[in-house]
């Protein structure tokens, strides 16, 4: 259930899996489903098939936390994309504002991440590579 960012949320909201929508902003190699969006909050799920690698992107003025619920998430970042972390189920990955990165799924099964973002502006900005931006 996407909420109009211009309308404040009043009260508790329940969003069931079938109510999530395809997020407007996508990156090749992964699928994002939006559950909640307000002026300064974005919550959803991202899925990546085994062996897939997303394109390089960043999240502008949004701080991002990813919680790994299935599979594994390799996140490449840093100068030239030479740094990486690999999150397993139960791990959290923090991505600061504007950090150019890409995700891949090195596991044999599908990767699923719960994503929570706080900030504003465009949620996803796709770029040509780790040195772009």
Predicted ranges, named:
Residues 1-45, 55, 126-133:
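A short, N-terminal "cap"/entry segment at the start of jelly-roll beta-barrel domains
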Residues 46, 65, 94, 109-126:
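A short hydrophobic beta-strand segment most commonly corresponding to one strand
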Residues 81-97:
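Short acidic-glycine-tyrosine-enriched beta hairpin
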Residues 53-55, 74, 93, 97-103:
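Histidine-centered metal-chelating micro-motifs
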Residues 45, 58, 77-79, 105, ...:
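Residue-level recognition of conserved beta-strand positions in structured domain cores
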Residues 79-86, 104-109:
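Beta-rich strand-turn-strand
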Residues 44-60, 97:
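Conserved short histidine dyad/triad with adjacent acidic residue
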Residues 47-48, 60-75, 118:
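Short, conserved beta-strand element in jelly-roll/cupin
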């Amino acid at each position: 259930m996407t909420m109009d960012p211009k309308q404040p949320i009043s009260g508790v909201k329940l969003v069931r899996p079938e109510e999530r929508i395809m997020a407007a902003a996508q990156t090749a190699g992964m699928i994002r489903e939006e559950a909640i969006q307000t002026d300064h909050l974005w919550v959803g799920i991202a899925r990546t098939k085994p062996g897939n690698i997303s394109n390089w992107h960043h999240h502008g003025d949004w701080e991002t936390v990813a919680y790994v619920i299935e599979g594994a998430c390799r996140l490449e970042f840093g100068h030239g994309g030479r740094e990486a972390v690999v999150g397993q189920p139960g791990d959290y990955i923090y991505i600061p504002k504007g950090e150019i990165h890409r995700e891949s799924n090195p596991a044999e099964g599908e990767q699923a991440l719960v994503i929570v973002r706080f900030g504003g502006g465009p949620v996803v900005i796709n770029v040509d590579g780790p040195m772009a931006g």
